[in-house]
Amino acid sequence: MPCQDTVSLSIQHTSVYVQHSCCVSTSTSASTSATALGLGCLACGIVGVLVVAGGLCCLINGRCPSCRRLALRSRSWKSPPASLCTNQPLAFNLRDLTRSDIRCTSDPRSVELLSDVHSVVSHRERPPAYDSLDFEPTEYTPEAFQ
């Protein structure tokens, strides 16, 4: 029965050859697609983490335009120091007046007076209608405030 052995051997050989070919090609393409998919997901994840970290750093350091706009809104308006020397009436909040704002006066008593006005006006028990007052600078006369 050599004929049966030959057929059997031929079928077995063909079967092994097909199996071997399928395994190699399937394994190679599967690892290639898995590697490409894995690297793509890994790259997207790294980019996402970097974008989030960069955004947080910008928010913390105040480098984002929205942060700067919020910081400008939170600051109160202060008059420039030179405008205190003019005779034009000024409208500003007296709570924001500090000694550093008054640089053009030569009389130290006027600085002390304005500092006292600042401490009185910034007291929290005042009614809300006095939050912003029109202020016109005048000459300091001790008799007017005693």
From Swiss-Prot:
GO terms for cellular component: host cell membrane; membrane. This is Non-structural protein 5. The gene is S7. It is a single-pass membrane protein. Belongs to the aquareoviridae NS5 protein family. It is found in: Host membrane. The keyword S-adenosyl-L-methionine does not apply. Its main location: host cell. The chain crosses the membrane at residues 36-56. Keywords: Host membrane, Membrane, Transmembrane, Transmembrane helix.
